[in-house]
């Protein structure tokens, strides 16, 4: 059966699968229901499934929620139908899966990476929003699949099922990597440091959506990702009565303000693009209380890891100086990071040559420019550094609102075309 015929046969099931993931979104490191459902499906298809600390270097995880939050998420997942044994094995902040299928003949190791986490977004309740009309709007407070990872999981399982049904046609080894905590670039490093792609010859990542210019397109590569680092900076001062004893205070809010203004003024870098953004600033408890704590949540980006490191260095200097100016102490905690990445240029024309004849996409450009960051870079860099090849592809979709917006939604036809594309790529490199 061709991959097109397979997707047509499984069309309704794949759409229902995506909608199920959409209804039960789980944010970074809390993907217990999603991961348990995926693992159970992969086991039933005959894959060798490793999960949890089998596929994670625990010391490399970043931005973990508290144990109380994780415990509540585990209990919720079980209440919502997750296999309790699998949830227990996933444990505290170990929601990662690698499924492997080895075929009878020797051949290359081909890997696809799929991200699972949702966003910290409250989904729209507007009547015209398709998940509202269809009854699959998020049922979890302050969590929404607003970046298409629900579709990614459905595509990954669609690929898994297609390959399992046709395993006699392939040679080599297929690895399906289901990664937690892509949002905030927190999860990939721990999987890479556990060695999950050290034997991989071809590494593929993929994203759905992007913008209207790429609707119903398939881009074969990316110009490259920006390196990025996510930091939390906390200033500690001393509270005092703002009217009767202001001289006794150490104003943490002023330290934070000084830092914010100067962080945004960091000089750009001559070797390429650089970014600085303070996304959250929290401080103060009352009108007449001098703030003793200020919290900044910020991110840096750079066209290369070198440029990003420059921005980080300047940021750390500014935060330290702002604290000293206002007689405060401070601490900086890294919550996530990913390096820059370049793709294997020779892969894009080859992928274009096998996707274009399918006739299901309006256009199949060699590459696209996203300007963002993605921790799939860890997987790609490791494979390429060890002599393999890798690329990150785009399934363009006519999204209803920008990524990370409460009204975000994809065209499910594009998701189905994505399964066809992934199956075609897998078949090409596993033959």
List each model region and its residues.
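Acidic/His- and Gly-rich active-site-bordering loop/insert found
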Residues: 2-145, 158, 169-170
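Divalent metal-coordination and catalytic microenvironments
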Residues: 21, 42, 112, 149, ...
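Metal-dependent amide/peptide-bond hydrolase catalytic core
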Residues: 44, 253-431
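Histidine/acidic-residue-rich, glycine-tolerant segments that coordinate divalent metal ions
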Residues: 63, 97, 119-121, 127-144, ...
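Short coil-to-beta-strand
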Residues: 109-112, 227-234, 292, 389-395
């Amino acid at each position: 059966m061709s991959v097109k015929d397979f997707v047509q046969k499984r069309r309704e099931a794949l759409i229902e699968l995506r909608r199920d993931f959409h209804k039960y979104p789980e944010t970074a490191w809390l993907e217990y229901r999603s991961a348990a459902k995926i693992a159970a499906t992969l086991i039933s298809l005959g894959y060798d499934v490793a999960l949890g600390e089998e596929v994670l270097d625990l010391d490399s995880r970043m931005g973990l929620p508290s144990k109380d939050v994780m415990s509540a998420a585990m209990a919720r997942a079980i209440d919502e139908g997750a296999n309790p044994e699998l949830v227990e094995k996933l444990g505290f902040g170990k929601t990662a899966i690698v499924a492997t299928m080895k075929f009878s003949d020797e051949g290359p190791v081909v890997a696809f990476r799929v991200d699972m986490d949702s966003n910290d977004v409250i989904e729209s309740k507007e009547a015209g929003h398709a998940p509202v009309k269809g009854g699959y709007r998020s049922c979890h407070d302050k969590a929404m699949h607003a970046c298409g990872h629900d579709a990614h999981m459905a595509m990954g399982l669609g690929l898994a099922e297609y390959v399992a049904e046709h395993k006699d046609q392939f040679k080599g080894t297929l690895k399906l990597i289901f990664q937690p905590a892509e949002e905030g670039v927190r999860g990939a490093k721990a999987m890479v440091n556990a060695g999950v792609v050290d034997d991989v010859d071809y590494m593929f990542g993929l994203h759905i959506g992007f913008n209207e210019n790429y609707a119903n397109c398939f881009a074969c590569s990316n110009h490259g990702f920006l390196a990025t680092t996510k930091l939390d900076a906390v200033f500690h001062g001393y509270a005092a009565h703002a009217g009767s004893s202001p001289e006794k205070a150490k104003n943490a809010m002023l330290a934070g303000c000084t830092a914010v203004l100067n962080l945004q003024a960091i000089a750009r870098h001559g070797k390429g693009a650089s970014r600085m953004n303070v996304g959250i600033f929290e401080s103060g408890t009352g009108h007449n209380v001098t703030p003793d704590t200020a919290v900044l949540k910020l991110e840096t980006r750079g066209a290369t890891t070198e440029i990003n490191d420059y921005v980080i260095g300047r940021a750390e200097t500014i935060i330290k100086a702002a604290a000293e100016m206002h007689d405060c102490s401070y601490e900086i905690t890294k919550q996530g990071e990913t390096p820059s990445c370049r793709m294997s240029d020779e892969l894009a024309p080859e992928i274009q040559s096998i996707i274009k004849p399918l006739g299901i996409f309006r256009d199949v450009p060699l590459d696209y420019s996203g300007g963002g960051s993605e921790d799939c870079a860890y997987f790609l860099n490791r494979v390429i550094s060890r002599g393999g090849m890798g690329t990150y592809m785009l399934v363009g979709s006519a999204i209803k609102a920008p990524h990370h917006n409460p009204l975000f939604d994809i065209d499910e036809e594009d998701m189905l075309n994505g399964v066809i594309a992934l199956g075609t790529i897998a078949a090409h490199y596993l033959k």
